[in-house]
Amino acid sequence: EQAAKIAKDLSVYNITWIKEPTRNNISEIEAIRKISCLPIALGENIIEKKDFEAICQKKLTDYLQLDLPRCAGITGFCEIANIALKNKIPLCSHLLYEISIGLTAAFPHGHMVEYDNLLPPGIFVETHSVRDGYLLPPQRPGNGATLTEQALKKYQTDSFF
């Protein structure tokens, strides 16, 4: 109820979407979908592929946002992106833009990449530039996240545990 009321109140501001209006509860998402007058974006907090399938098949979102670590990495991202493509739902990525920009751009329904630079500057060989509000993907092979020699030395550890 609260999310639906907020969506109605926000509708006068011409916002792009309401993001994650509820946690990963399919029945709550269905209820909000029925009464929301705003587009919905969700997915960044979803882990299970079956939940993504249900959301896409039932058209419970206008934009599917994938969080690379939560959706089983690159393989999971690609599998779920194909589910969204099959259901004609635009694909967006959540965080880790350094890697997810190339993944999102690889799909015809790739729509938007969340740009939130949480890492120290100069950590990657690739530079990511923004032009006219658009984040441009690197123009070289790879996933777009090659660590610099300085970063490798600075953040090196002797063991994983």
Describe each model-derived feature in a short phrase.
Residues 5, 92-161:
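Flexible C-terminal active-site loop/helix
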